[in-house]
Amino acid sequence: MRSDRIKKGFERAPHRSLLRATGLNDGDFEKPFIGIANSHIDIIPGHYYLQEYGRIAKDEIRKAGGVPFEFNTIGVDDGIAMGHEGMRYSLPSRELIADSIETVMNAHQLDALVCIPNCDKIVPGMLMGALRVNVPTVFVSGGPMKAGHLHDGTPIDLNTAFEAVGKRAQGQITDAELYEIECQACPSGGSCSGMFTANSMNVLCEAMGVALPGNGTVLALTPEREALVRRAARRAVEIAADERFRLRNLVNRDAIHNAMVVDMAMGGSSNTVLHMLAISREAGAPLSLRDIEEIAGKVSHIAKIAPSLATVHMEDIHRAGGVPAVLREAARRGGIVREDALTVTGETVGERIRGARTADPELIRPLENAYSPVGGLAVLFGNLAAEGAVVKTAGIQPSMRTFTGEAICFDSQDEAIAGIMGGKVKPGHFVVIRYEGPKGGPGMQEMLSPTSLIMGMGLGESVALVTDGRFSGATRGACVGHVSPEAAEGGVIGLVQDGDRITIDVAARALTVDVSDAELARRREGFRPKRRDPGSSWLRRYAHLVTNAANGAVLRSTDL
């Protein structure tokens, strides 16, 4: 066992002495040491109860013959961090979480790992760190929250609350109506109830085989979720000494491919592209945006969940058959699903999905009745995004899939919010928000506030938005993000001027600005990218080391 390095031999008497101080005895030194990376934090609805899941996991590990050691990571709630300087810390927190997992696991030479994440950057951060450690690992998330409901029974979620702000600003709803939405949108603990970033990443963990079936869709704070935690903890002990289940043996090119298949079939958050680029690099099987676009062209979009379809939430998809049913339906197009990929249960993906059935063909549609013959995410290229940009096609109205608009430029999210609220954005505009990329922000803020304002103010079918920042998984509409190169590194998005004509053509996978190469070259002659001092030593370091979105916004280490 790896942990023998800290517990075997006379030389390790001091180490054992310290371990005895934590309650270990002679018999424990013969057992596998299992790390539990928890992300309990009181302020996040999907995490405030994870301390109890950690306790359950420890109990099960002991019963199964292991010795548990629980430790914690930090966490950021993107919804609470939204719309102010706190959002600059969200994406950087992914790197801190990955580093902390690597640090604790390798410093103490633990044999296996149970990861208990749930929201936003915590899932990919844990997965990146666990891949570096490369011990047998099982993921079990905290689970999605229930959908909220208004007094008339209408299902709502957090995105409803964000869009309600725009409606209130326009006088379309009253303070009382806004208050009802505020009080009902998030009715329980759990990750926000739609196919937002947290649930998207938890679904992808299931698709990659690093989590048990149900990980992405079983509701939080239910007996079924608790049982999932128990099974995951026991499984970590069972595989602790089995080389087949070292994490990089599971998260290989086939598993990453399957994750992107499910992502496209379910129209996941655009943030999944950013995270899977980063995860694939840690796995030693790097994806590119071209790879992702190739997969998108072969996978039908068969499930729509909020925000793409406001009435459908994760609990509905679970009742309809969950991720196994989605994979099984996608696999009907031969060769799309890599069915030989091994999962943490010891089954292959093919074996896992063989008995899956779709209980509601309107929620998980057959291929013959797909929403689209291609995936719910798309990668765009063009002179405005030479290295690529990402759009959630699942959330775009058909009338906006091809759109040309007049650029109105903002050099920060704050400027854009003020401009939208102040009535500067009109039908026919193509909003440009720049200097919000990984380096320029720094931190690549999510643009849920401006996109929700656009939708809430009734501009969703007449205004598009493009940014080198990113979006919440709750964003919908003609919103293109992750533009690379970003403005801060000299990207063309920094050269766009008010009045330029910008075109998005989803079918052609194109994002262009109608400005000649000669004119762009002329503008570049006097162009100096803006530099923003974040007033934080951590964010300064982050800005210095981070790559652009086309590379997953990972930190460079080669120049250190």
Curated annotation (Swiss-Prot):
Co-factor requirement: [2Fe-2S] cluster; Mg(2+)
Active site, UniProt feature: S472 (proton acceptor)
UniProt keywords, alphabetically: 2Fe-2S, Amino-acid biosynthesis, Branched-chain amino acid biosynthesis, Iron, Iron-sulfur, Lyase, Magnesium, Metal-binding
Modification N6-carboxylysine occurs at: K121
GO BP annotation list: isoleucine biosynthetic process; L-valine biosynthetic process
Cofactor binding summary note: Binds 1 [2Fe-2S] cluster per subunit. This cluster acts as a Lewis acid cofactor.
Matches recorded under InterPro entries: Dihydro-acid_dehy_C, DihydroxyA_deHydtase, DiOHA_6PGluconate_deHydtase_CS, ILV_EDD_C, ILV_EDD_N, IlvD/EDD_N
Pathway assignment: Amino-acid biosynthesis; L-isoleucine biosynthesis; L-isoleucine from 2-oxobutanoate: step 3/4; Amino-acid biosynthesis; L-valine biosynthesis; L-valine from pyruvate: step 3/4
Binding site for Mg(2+): D78, D120, K121, E446
Enzymatic reactions: (2R)-2,3-dihydroxy-3-methylbutanoate = 3-methyl-2-oxobutanoate + H2O; (2R,3R)-2,3-dihydroxy-3-methylpentanoate = (S)-3-methyl-2-oxopentanoate + H2O
GO MF, one annotated term: magnesium ion binding
A GO term from the CC aspect: cytosol
Binding site for [2Fe-2S] cluster: C119, C192
Domain of life assignment: Bacteria
EC identifiers of the protein: 4.2.1.9
Pfam family, one: ILVD_EDD_N
Record's subunit section: Homodimer.
UniProt similarity note: Belongs to the IlvD/Edd family.
Function (record text): Functions in the biosynthesis of branched-chain amino acids. Catalyzes the dehydration of (2R,3R)-2,3-dihydroxy-3-methylpentanoate (2,3-dihydroxy-3-methylvalerate) into 2-oxo-3-methylpentanoate (2-oxo-3-methylvalerate) and of (2R)-2,3-dihydroxy-3-methylbutanoate (2,3-dihydroxyisovalerate) into 2-oxo-3-methylbutanoate (2-oxoisovalerate), the penultimate precursor to L-isoleucine and L-valine, respectively.
The protein's name: Dihydroxy-acid dehydratase
Gene name of the record: ilvD
